[in-house]
Amino acid sequence: PRLYCFLDDRIQEARQEASSHSEYQRLIQNAANALKADLTAIGNPYSQINVIKRYVQSLYQAYYLTQQETYAKRLHELLQLLLNTPVSDAVLFADNFGSTNIAYCFLKPYDLLYKRLSSEERQSVENLLMRVLRFYYPQQQGTQENRIFDNHFWQQNLRVLFQATFLLYDNEALQDEVLPIMEYYYELWTARAPASGFNRDGMWANGTGYFNNNVYTLFYMPMLLSHITRKDFLLHPWYRNAGQALTFTCPPESRNIGFGDNSEKYTTSTYQYAAFADFLARETEDGYAGWYARQAAKTLVRDNDMRLYRMASNTLSYGTELPADCPK
């Protein structure tokens, strides 16, 4: 599998210790829900794509970590359910989140089950992913690099579109078309991420409410790009300051500073904040992030998106005391 290639040097040990991990039962329970689902009751899977997406995520994580065949079998069945229901342009491009949710449900099994898919299944997945890339890339080229911030694009769409190119870039029939698209999204990230391209202080200019929706991409993209390029994308000043920014603007077990849309909804730190702090602490040894993750430990385990990362990175420990020079 390519999508989590940055875990290649950790996953074997993690598999041996998986059942003793504190989050193992949550991982297995989520996958069990996908196994128990009655797929015959799903008439049009695209009308329930958010449910399908949740199943795909859970099964991908469970099979990748445990290698138990039952998870791969059900993941394959979900892909076949989608492939057996042709999706029209009207449905595929009804909205951009819908497009990338559908693409996600195709590219995950394609990545994990590639060797067991038939040539027809592979071709069908590739056709779907190319439909999405061919629709959005021309619209985004020349636009996204000149916009201040397109919420949906940076929250999810860039990540999924880049993943699609990462799976297809060496396909002989597609590489001439895919490589320039892949390069565009790579250059766009290096120029405008993680926070518009000019933010260095670790704050999220779009507001504390929207930060939740960006956390997974803010974790995933630098991890993948660092692995591919052998350059540390977490050296960006924004990442170096994000732990302290979280600590002072969204303290654990406390209200946030109230900046931006939906900030009023949260009376305590969210599991997304906690998961991001844990990630920063593991990868950068940031003292503020380590303290934050410890304080929000009970909230942290609710996060599903980064659970595979945490379980694969269990040997990476971090300090949990506030830095001695923390402003009082």
Q: In which residue ranges do the predicted regions lie?
A:
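Aromatic-lined, polymer-binding surfaces characteristic
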Residues: 3-4, 15-17, 24-32, 36-250
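Extended, small/polar residue-biased N-terminal targeting/export presequences
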Residues: 9, 13-19
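N-terminal carbohydrate-binding accessory modules
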Residues: 1-2, 6-9
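Extended polysaccharide-engagement surfaces of secreted carbohydrate-active enzymes
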Residues: 206, 210-328
